[in-house]
């Protein structure tokens, strides 16, 4: 039940994949992704950009501005796990999908305060202090409309997995990017 034009566009794409699969033109699979954290690269203009920035920028010596309250929860999945999910979706037999070709991937819910606390435990106070709260009502209004918890029993039954915790997500980003901490 999409609540935005963006969500409507995504559902239209999912329906097309399902319909073309039903007609035998392709063997399609549509994955609904949580917010991907920690994305490498630079911040962008997406409302979700802060979710990676509050980790990525401080670990790279740069101040990050967090536009939402510390209590804000984010449903997330790491780049490693999303790559694993795409490979797993490809490798699953067509029969495993049945007639439903759309799947919400598992993820974990982390609040901004939990994420910053994990960053502090891993990289120290000086790094965590680079996260500065600068409220942005426009972004906050968008983010507060996002669900923060999903039940994904079908995905789990098909072998898809979430990250175990935010500490693992942060440590994997540090390892993947070759960042030295402490």
Functional labels for PLM-detected ranges:
Residues 58, 86-90, 119, 152, ...:
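Hydrophobic "lid"/C-terminal helical patch
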